[in-house]
Amino acid sequence: MKIIIDECVPHIVKKRLIEREIKTVQEMGWAGVKNGELLKFVEAEFDVFITSDKNLRYQQNLKDREIAILLLPSDQVPVIENLLPQIDEELENIKLGDFIEI
C-alpha cells in the first residue's frame, strides 16, 4: 500500500511508521498544488492520502475516488503522536474509496 501525507501533516507520521511505504507531498514535488489537482496526482500513484485539511470533503467531490483518505483531527505534533497507534490500525484496515476521520 502506497501512502502519501499532505503538506499540512507533521512528518512524524512518516518517521514513526517506518514499516510503511510513505511519501510526502513535498518529496513528490507537489507542495503548493491546489487540492483538486493534488488529488488527481495522488490517485495516479498512491492508495492512501493522509491529511488534516478538514475542508477537503467540502471543497472537493470525493465520491468515486480511487484512493482512501484518512483525515486527522489536528496538525499539532503532540496530538498526532498520541494518535499514531490508531493511525497505524486504520491503515491496516483501510480500503480504496474509504474516507476515515480520526
Locate each region found by the language model.
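N-terminal first-folded block
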Residues: 1-45
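Short glycine-/acidic-enriched loop or helix-start segments at secondary-structure transitions
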Residues: 14-15, 59-61, 81
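Residue-level detector of flexible, active-site-proximal loop/helix-junction positions
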Residues: 29, 56, 76
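Acidic, metal-binding active-site segment of PIN/NYN-like and related structure-specific nucleases
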Residues: 42, 46-60
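C-terminal structural segments of small proteins and small subunits
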Residues: 68-102
